[in-house]
């Protein structure tokens, strides 16, 4: 045990698809260092990807391993710790039962991270690495995470993420899904490549920044690729030429599958993982012009440990999420031909109203971000059809991959965009009813603010360049200067005022002063 005085200890337990991992680290003299790392193989991924459930045999094994990890944490006098789970538990149909039993048997609260949460944490450490490696030279990069059950993509323009998407197809899941075909063909590799083409060929990487110049990969199979290539992995990253990876892939494809493990001294399961990871990596090379692949050491627990031991880093992470989420939403809005000037106008107005009402809405920065996303994306439904464009917008937004945002958060943003006209939320709707009372209140509050902001640019001509907002007694006073004809905006504002007052108990009033006075 290497714990020292005047240090803080924290731990992360990661329930992965094929490993149960724990990392214990300490903060001493402003530096984070590892005290211990443990990992045990599990087969949760194989089980879930083939049966959709985690068996009680696997649950009992997992519980016993967690008890052992708990004892190790006591030995190190660990303070804060987090237990997180990713794809396997996320996709298990009986995940609620599993999480409940682990809470009862181990007194551990398991956080099942959604795809975008998991990827954003990993990408944040990749971005830290790129910041150090590139220095002042800011270059674009396609950052991809090859997990056991998912592949995550993000495009970095040198300052922020501008695109993010997840595919439910990782290295283990890819092999397990197609394993039934393996005995029916002598060219299993061709089947895998064709399947990857059908899945990944529809990814539309933004081209605003030109060709993506760097390809950055991370994930569970990366160390395996490095081992087979005899690459030194002692530093914080390593690089392998694309030609070398393609040649390795050709060698694997030309050998009978049973000989791959013998040739590279790998267990059968590792050989399957090597092939699947390489197949995905080769396909990802099509999205970049780089002649090499960068493999930084960036794992989920790196970010979680950092946030626990250095709390201010979590504030920086949240700001990174906000900037990248807005950037991704703006790129999607452009693809759907949304009116950028209008959406930016009401986004500014909505944020001003939100910020001046902190004592009345009780919402935080995350909900403010949802308001911004709704403003940016609320017109995307017009791309499908003018008829029922609000419902079209709702259907599109709720299923969007926006950097760092959860499914529930995107559902809330979709509802805010859905009710931006003359309609108001109804708790009788199945979707609204599926939200908790707390989240339904969030929807109502954001809708009330959003509709008021949208009314101020009803003509979509930005007649009001700016507004000032103040609360006075039981009134919300919104004032502006303009010489334009604002009859439409005043009418829309009056239509939205009753619902706003119903939600907040404040009567909104609009005061326009002529700019000529």
Language model features with spans:
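A short amphipathic beta-strand at an alpha->beta junction
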Residues: 291, 504-517
């Amino acid at each position: 045990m290497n714990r020292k005085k005047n240090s803080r200890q924290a731990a992360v337990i990661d329930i992965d698809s094929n490993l149960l991992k724990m990392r214990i680290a300490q903060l001493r003299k402003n530096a984070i260092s590892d005290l211990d790392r443990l990992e045990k193989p599990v087969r949760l991924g194989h089980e879930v990807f083939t049966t959709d459930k985690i068996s009680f045999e696997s649950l009992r094994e997992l519980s016993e391993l967690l008890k052992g990890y708990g004892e190790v944490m006591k030995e190190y006098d660990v303070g804060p710790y987090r237990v997180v789970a990713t794809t396997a538990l996320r996709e298990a149909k009986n995940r609620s039962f599993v999480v409940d039993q682990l809470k009862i048997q181990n007194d551990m609260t398991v956080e099942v991270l959604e795809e975008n949460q998991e990827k954003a944490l990993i990408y944040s450490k990749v971005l830290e690495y790129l910041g150090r490696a590139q220095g002042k030279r800011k270059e674009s990069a396609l950052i991809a995470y090859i997990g056991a059950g998912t592949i995550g993509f993000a495009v970095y323009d040198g300052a922020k993420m501008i695109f993010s998407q997840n595919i439910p197809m990782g290295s283990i899941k890819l092999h397990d899904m197609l394993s039934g075909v393996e005995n029916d063909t002598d060219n299993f590799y061709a089947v895998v490549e064709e399947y990857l083409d059908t899945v990944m060929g529809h990814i539309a990487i933004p081209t605003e920044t030109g060709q993506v110049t760097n390809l950055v990969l991370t994930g569970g199979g990366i160390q395996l690729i490095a081992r087979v290539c005899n690459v030194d992995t002692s530093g914080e990253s390593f690089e392998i030429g694309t030609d070398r990876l393609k040649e390795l892939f050709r060698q694997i494809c030309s050998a009978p599958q049973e000989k791959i493990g013998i040739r590279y001294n790998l267990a059968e399961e590792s050989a399957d993982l090597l092939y699947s990871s390489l197949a995905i990596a080769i396909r990802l090379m099509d999205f970049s012009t780089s002649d090499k692949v960068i493999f930084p050491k960036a794992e989920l627990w790196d970010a979680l440990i950092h946030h626990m031991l250095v709390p201010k880093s979590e504030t920086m992470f949240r700001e990174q999420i906000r900037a990248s989420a807005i950037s991704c939403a703006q790129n999607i809005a452009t693809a759907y031909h949304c009116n950028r000037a209008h959406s930016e106008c009401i986004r500014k107005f909505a944020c001003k109203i939100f910020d001046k009402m902190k004592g009345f809405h009780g919402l935080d920065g995350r909900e403010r971000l949802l308001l911004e996303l709704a403003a940016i994306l609320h017109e995307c439904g017009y791309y499908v059809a003018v008829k029922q464009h609000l419902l079209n917008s709702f259907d599109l937004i709720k299923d969007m991959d926006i950097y760092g945002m959860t499914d529930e958060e995107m559902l809330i943003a979709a509802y805010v965009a859905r009710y931006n006209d003359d309609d108001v939320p109804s708790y009788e709707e199945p979707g609204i009813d599926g939200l908790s009372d707390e989240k339904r209140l969030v929807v109502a509050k954001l809708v009330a603010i959003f509709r008021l902001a949208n009314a101020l640019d009803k003509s979509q001509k930005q007649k009001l360049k700016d507004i000032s907002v103040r609360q006075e007694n039981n009134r919300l006073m919104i004032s502006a200067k303009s010489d334009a004809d604002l009859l439409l905006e005043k009418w829309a504002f009056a239509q939205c005022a009753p619902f706003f007052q119903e939600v907040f108990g404040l009567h909104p009033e609009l005061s326009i002063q002529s700019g000529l006075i």
